[in-house]
């Protein structure tokens, strides 16, 4: 396991980003950003004709709170699915046609953000990165 010491991670951070577009115009892009107090990410894939956009974004706080949103935008509109363990969220209420998945908050949190550590995000299959 990892040992966590706040002085060791204070101010430490890392980020990566990517963007690709083929000759037709299909694209994907994304970034990961993390530091001792949390991290954020975003990924998106879209076709050349604007017919569909699929993506996800999210954040993690040092205290263990997480929010991950996966979405699809197409001719049917924008549809989002929110996965979170944040206090005050209620999965029985569906705000603006958005599905909220409330997880149990962790009782103990053992560390900060570790660059390169996997935090439960599943990128759409088209990305080929995970």
UniProtKB/Swiss-Prot annotation:
Pfam families assigned to the protein according to its UniProt record, in alphabetical order: Chitin_bind_4 (PF00379)
Chitin-binding type R&R domain span: 24-90
UniProt keyword terms in alphabetical order: Cuticle
Cellular component per GO, a single term: chitin-based extracellular matrix
PROSITE patterns assigned to the protein according to its UniProt record, in alphabetical order: CHIT_BIND_RR_1, CHIT_BIND_RR_2
Keyword 4Fe-4S belongs to the record: no
Gene Ontology MF terms: structural constituent of chitin-based larval cuticle
Protein's name in the database: Cuticle protein 14 isoform b
């Amino acid at each position: 396991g990892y040992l966590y010491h706040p002085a060791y991670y204070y101010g430490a951070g890392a980020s990566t980003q990517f963007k690709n577009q083929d000759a037709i115009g299909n694209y994907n892009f994304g970034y990961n950003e993390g530091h001792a107090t949390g991290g954020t990410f975003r990924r998106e894939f879209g076709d050349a004709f604007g017919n569909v956009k699929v993506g996800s974004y999210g954040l993690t706080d040092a205290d263990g709170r997480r929010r991950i949103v996966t979405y699809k935008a197409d001719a049917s509109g924008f549809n989002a699915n929110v996965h979170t363990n944040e206090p005050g969220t209620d999965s029985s209420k569906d705000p603006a046609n958005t599905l909220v998945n409330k997880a149990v908050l962790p009782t103990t949190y053992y560390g900060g953000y570790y660059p390169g550590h996997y935090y439960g995000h599943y990128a759409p299959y088209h990305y080929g990165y995970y």
